[in-house]
């Protein structure tokens, strides 16, 4: 990305300090800026090491972008933020859109399940492919928020868990 994009991101970081995720526009395109969680109280015990988890999320996104997986484009990142290109509305938004026919909704869902199966065939596990974490734009499915932190090495179990999360 251009230096001016990076400069714009730095300004946004100052304006949105502590805001976990927000959408912004730059030169007519939309992006999402995400920052590490800032946990307090009991959440520190329930979700320890938020900076480490954020770093792992960046590494996963880098890898998935490099292999051409169906994820939003990672445009910029550091230890303190990441910027993703907007991948469109999520499936839950599409499915609640009363202007779409059931045939159109089924087409979107069918596309998502085909891509999820394709990910699994490549040995990629999502961890929790909820419809709120799957976007659809211009006929293209993108998966977000990979959460495969399971200690299990049983690929069949992990794939089954993904399918159950998708169907939930």
Please annotate each region the language model reported.
Residues 1-9:
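A short, low-complexity linker immediately N-terminal to eukaryotic Hanks-type protein kinase catalytic domains
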Residues 8-55:
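ATP-binding glycine-rich loop module of kinase domains
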Residues 37, 50-54, 58, 65, ...:
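Conserved structural core of kinase catalytic domains
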Residues 45-46, 97-101, 147-155:
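Short helix/strand-bridging catalytic loops that position acidic/His residues to coordinate divalent metals
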Residues 64, 112-119:
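Conserved hydrophobic alpha-helix
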Residues 88, 131, 148:
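Short, glycine/acidic-enriched loop or turn micro-motifs at the edges of active sites
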Residues 121-133:
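Catalytic-loop of the protein kinase fold
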Residues 137, 141-168:
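C-lobe/activation-segment region of protein kinase-like
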């Amino acid at each position: 990305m251009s230096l001016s994009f990076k400069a714009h991101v730095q300004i946004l970081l100052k304006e949105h300090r502590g805001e976990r995720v927000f959408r912004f526009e730059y030169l007519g395109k939309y992006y999402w800026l995400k920052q590490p969680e800032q946990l307090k109280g009991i959440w520190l015990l329930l979700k320890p090491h938020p900076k480490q988890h954020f770093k792992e999320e960046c590494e996963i996104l880098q890898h998935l972008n490099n292999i051409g997986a169906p994820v939003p484009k990672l445009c910029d990142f550091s230890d303190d933020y990441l910027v993703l290109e907007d991948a469109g509305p999520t499936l839950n938004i599409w499915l609640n859109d009363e202007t779409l026919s059931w045939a159109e909704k089924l087409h979107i869902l069918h596309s998502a399940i085909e891509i999820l199966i394709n990910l699994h065939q490549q040995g990629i596990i999502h961890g929790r492919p909820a419809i709120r974490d799957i976007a659809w734009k211009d006929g293209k499915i993108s998966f977000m928020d990979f959460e495969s932190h399971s200690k299990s090495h049983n690929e069949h179990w992990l794939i089954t868990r993904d399918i159950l999360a998708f169907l939930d």
